[in-house]
C-alpha cells in the first residue's frame, strides 16, 4: 500500500537544520564547548599543582588565550538569528577567565602572616612574599586595584601595631593641670600651692609602689606577650629642648627672669612626660615582672635627675656674662621647686586614683559637705541658739491646751458610748427575759378586748331573738347584722384582725348554722379562708422607724396578715406533700394558732385581699401585740 499524499495546505516548511550553514554553526558550537571544558580542566590541574608547591605563581598559557580569541572572532563573524545575544555572553566569560586566572595568588595577602620589623617598614616599594591559602574562596575574583590596596594595607598593619598604647594606664578622670597628656606647671600654680619635698628621688621612690601594683595587675587571658616600651622619642625631644634653651640663654646678655622661668618650665616637660610613660612587662613569673618594673622606673628617674642637673648647669653657664646676683639663685631654686611640684602632682594623682575605691559612703558625704561649704552652698540656718530657745516653750504650751481639750472630748465620747451600750443591753434583756409587769399589761389588754367582743355578741343575740324565728327571717337578720358590722368597721378606727378571728369563733360556738352564712358562703363549700403570716423588706424598714418611738418599743416583729383561700381537699393532704410544695409562710385560722407559732410579741398589719369578699376590699391596717 502506498502512503496517501499530503495536501499542500498541511505540508510544513523544510527545516533549517538540514542546511549546511546551520550544520557548520552547530559544529563550531560543539568545538567551542569542548575547548572550554578542556581549558577549565587544565586550569584546575594547574591550580592544584601550584597550591601543593606553595611558592610558584599561577600563570596561563598564551596558546589557550589565543585559541579563545580565535573562537571569539568566529562567533562574531557568524550571523545567527536564533542566537543573537550569545556572543556577548561568551565574550564576557572569556574575559573573566583571562582576567581572573593570573590574579589568583594576589588575594592571599589577607591571611598571610608578615614578619616585618618597625625599622624596615619604611621601604614601601619592597615586594612581599605571597603565601597562597586554600581557605579563601574569594581569591579567584580579585582585580589589580584590589591586590594593590591589599599590599599597601599589609605593609601598614605592622606599623600600626607597633604604636605604643597610651590608653592602657591613663586614668579615667583627667589629671588636674594636664594638657594633652602633659602636666602644665602654669595650670598647677593657678590653683595649688607648692608642696615642700626634700628631693626628687624621694618623690620617685614614693611613686614606685603605685606603678608596681599597676604593672602587676592581671591582664586578659588571651594576650600572649606584651612588649616593653622605650622612651627614645621622649629622650630625643628632651635633648633638643635642652639645646634650644641653652643657645637662647647664651645669645641673650640680660634675659628677663620671666622668660627664664618659662623656659625652665618648658625644659621640665619632657621629664614629666617620661614619668608618665607606660611600663609593661612580658608575661612570666611575678619576680621577673617586679624586677623589670623597678629597673625601668629607676632608669627613668635617674634620667630625670640628670636632665635637671644639665638644665641647672646650662642655666648657670648662660648667666656668666651677667654679674652674680640673687636673681640667678632664685631662678635655679624656682626650677627645682617646679620639678619637685611636678613629681608630687603625679604622685598625688596616682595615690588619689588608688585610694578612691576604699572610700566609704560616710567619707563621701563628709567630703561633699566640705566641698559645698567651700563653694558657699550650705543651707542658711538661725545664727545662734539663744534666739531659738523661747520657741520650744511656745510649742510646748500649745500641745498642753490641745491635750486637755482632747481629754474632755474623749470623756464625752466614752460617756455617750456607755449610755448607748446600756440601752442596748436593757433592750436585749427585755427581749430575752420579759418583765412580769409587761406580761400583766399584755393580759389586761387581751381580756379587755375579749370582753368587748362578748358584749358585741350579746347584742347580736338580742336583735336576732326580737325578730321572727323563721329560718328565712333569721337569714335576713344575719344579713342585716353583717351589713351593720361592715358599717361599724368603716366608721370605727381600725381594729385588730384578732377581733374578727374571735368573732368568727364566737359565732361558730353560738350558732352552728352561721358557718354557712359567713362571707365564705359566696365561695364553694370545698374552700376555706385562712390568714397568711408573712413579712417583706418594707415592713423591716417600717419596724426600724417604729423602734425610735417609745410607745411601740415593745414590739419585736412586724408582720402581715393576709386572708387567702385554701382547698379543703389539699389541706387534708398537705402533710404528705414535700417541702417544696408547702407554703413558705404559715397560714392560721385562729388566735390560738398564732400563739402556737410564738408570735405573742409580734405586731400584725391586716392586708386586704380584693380577690375575696368585699369586706376585705378596703385597707384596714391594725397593730396588736
UniProtKB/Swiss-Prot annotation:
Residue numbers carrying Phosphothreonine: 518, 521, 535-536
Family stated for the protein in its record: Belongs to the CKAP2 family.
Protein name: Cytoskeleton-associated protein 2
GO cellular component terms attached to this protein's record: cytoplasm; microtubule; microtubule cytoskeleton
Subcellular location: Cytoplasm, Cytoskeleton
Domain of life: Eukaryota
Ranges of biased composition (kind: Polar residues): 1-22, 107-128
Designated gene of the protein: CKAP2
Gene Ontology biological process terms in this record: apoptotic process; negative regulation of microtubule depolymerization
Broad class of the protein's primary localization: cytoplasm
Known function: Possesses microtubule stabilizing properties. Involved in regulating aneuploidy, cell cycling, and cell death in a p53/TP53-dependent manner.
One Pfam family recorded for the sequence: CKAP2_C
Keywords: Apoptosis, Cell cycle, Cytoplasm, Cytoskeleton, Microtubule, Phosphoprotein
Listed PANTHER family: CYTOSKELETON ASSOCIATED PROTEIN 2-RELATED, CYTOSKELETON-ASSOCIATED PROTEIN 2
Region annotation (Disordered) ranges: 1-27, 104-138, 153-173, 195-237, 259-282, 322-398, 484-521
Basic and acidic residues biased stretches: 159-170, 359-373, 500-514
Modified positions (Phosphotyrosine) in chain numbering: 538
Assembly, per entry: Associates with alpha- and beta-tubulins.
Positions where Phosphoserine occurs in the chain: 190, 534, 541
Amino acid at each position: 500500500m502506498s502512503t496517501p499524499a499530503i495536501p499542500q495546505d498541511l505540508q510544513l516548511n523544510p527545516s533549517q537544520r538540514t542546511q549546511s550553514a546551520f550544520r557548520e554553526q552547530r559544529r563550531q558550537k560543539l568545538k567551542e564547548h569542548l575547548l572550554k571544558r578542556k581549558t577549565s580542566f587544565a586550569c584546575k590541574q594547574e591550580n592544584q599543582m601550584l597550591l601543593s608547591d606553595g611558592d610558584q605563581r599561577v600563570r596561563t598559557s598564551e596558546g589557550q588565550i589565543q585559541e579563545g580569541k580565535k573562537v571569539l572572532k568566529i562567533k562574531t563573524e557568524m550571523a545567527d538569528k536564533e542566537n543573537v545575544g550569545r556572543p556577548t555572553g561568551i565574550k564576557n566569560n572569556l574575559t573573566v577567565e583571562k582576567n581572573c586566572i593570573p590574579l589568583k595568588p594576589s588575594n592571599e595577602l589577607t591571611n598571610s602572616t608578615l614578619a616585618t620589623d618597625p625599622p624596615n617598614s619604611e621601604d614601601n616599594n619592597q615586594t612581599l612574599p605571597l603565601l597562597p591559602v586554600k581557605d579563601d574562596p574569594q581569591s579567584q575574583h580579585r582585580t589589580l586595584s584590589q591586590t594593590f590596596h591589599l599590599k599597601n594595607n599589609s605593609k601598614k598593619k605592622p606599623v600600626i601595631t607597633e604604636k605604643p598604647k597610651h590608653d592602657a594606664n591613663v586614668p579615667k578622670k583627667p589629671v588636674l593641670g594636664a594638657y594633652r597628656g602633659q602636666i602644665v606647671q602654669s595650670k598647677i600654680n593657678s590653683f595649688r600651692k607648692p608642696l615642700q619635698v626634700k628631693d626628687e628621688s624621694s618623690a620617685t621612690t614614693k611613686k614606685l609602689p603605685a606603678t608596681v601594683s599597676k604593672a602587676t595587675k592581671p591582664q586578659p587571658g588571651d594576650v600572649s606577650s606584651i612588649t616593653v616600651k622605650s622612651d627614645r622619642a621622649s629622650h630625643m625631644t628632651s635633648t633638643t629642648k635642652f639645646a634650644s634653651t641653652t643657645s637662647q640663654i647664651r645669645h641673650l646678655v640680660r634675659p628677663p627672669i620671666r622668660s627664664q622661668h618659662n623656659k625652665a618650665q618648658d625644659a621640665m616637660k619632657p621629664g614629666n612626660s617620661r614619668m608618665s610613660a607606660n611600663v609593661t612587662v612580658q608575661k612570666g613569673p611575678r619576680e621577673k615582672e617586679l624586677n623589670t618594673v623597678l629597673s625601668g622606673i629607676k632608669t627613668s628617674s635617674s634620667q630625670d635627675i640628670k636632665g635637671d642637673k644639665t638644665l641647672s648647669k646650662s642655666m648657670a653657664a648662660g648667666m656668666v656674662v651677667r654679674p652674680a646676683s640673687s636673681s640667678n639663685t632664685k631662678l635655679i631654686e624656682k626650677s627645682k621647686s617646679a620639678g619637685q611640684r611636678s613629681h608630687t602632682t603625679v604622685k598625688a594623682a596616682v595615690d588619689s586614683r588608688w585610694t578612691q575605691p576604699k572610700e566609704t559612703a560616710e567619707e563621701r558625704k563628709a567630703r561633699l559637705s566640705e566641698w559645698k561649704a567651700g563653694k558657699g552652698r550650705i543651707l542658711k540656718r538661725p545664727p545662734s541658739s539663744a534666739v531659738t530657745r523661747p520657741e520650744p516653750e511656745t510649742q510646748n504650751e500649745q500641745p498642753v491646751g490641745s491635750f486637755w481639750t482632747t481629754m474632755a472630748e474623749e470623756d464625752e465620747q466614752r460617756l455617750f458610748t456607755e449610755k448607748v451600750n446600756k440601752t442596748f443591753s436593757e433592750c436585749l434583756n427585755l427581749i430575752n427575759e420579759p418583765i412580769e409587769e409587761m406580761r400583766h399589761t399584755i393580759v389586761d389588754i387581751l381580756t379587755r378586748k375579749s370582753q368587748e367582743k362578748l358584749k358585741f355578741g350579746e347584742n347580736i343575740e338580742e336583735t336576732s331573738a326580737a325578730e321572727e324565728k323563721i329560718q328565712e327571717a333569721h337569714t335576713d337578720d344575719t344579713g342585716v347584722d353583717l351589713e351593720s358590722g361592715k358599717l361599724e368597721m368603716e366608721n370605727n378606727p381600725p381594729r385588730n384582725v384578732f377581733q374578727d378571728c374571735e368573732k368568727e369563733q364566737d359565732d361558730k360556738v353560738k350558732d352552728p348554722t352561721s358557718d354557712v352564712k359567713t362571707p365564705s358562703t359566696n365561695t364553694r363549700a370545698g374552700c376555706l379562708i385562712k390568714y397568711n403570716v408573712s413579712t417583706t423588706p418594707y415592713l423591716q424598714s417600717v419596724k426600724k422607724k417604729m423602734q425610735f418611738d417609745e410607745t411601740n418599743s415593745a414590739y419585736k416583729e412586724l408582720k402581715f396578715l393576709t386572708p387567702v383561700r385554701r382547698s379543703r381537699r389539699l389541706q387534708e393532704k398537705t402533710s404528705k406533700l414535700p417541702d417544696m410544695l408547702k407554703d413558705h409562710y404559715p397560714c392560721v385560722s385562729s388566735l390560738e394558732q398564732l400563739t402556737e407559732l410564738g408570735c405573742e410579741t409580734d405586731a400584725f398589719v391586716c392586708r386586704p385581699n380584693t380577690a375575696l369578699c368585699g369586706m376585705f376590699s378596703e385597707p384596714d391596717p391594725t397593730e396588736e401585740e
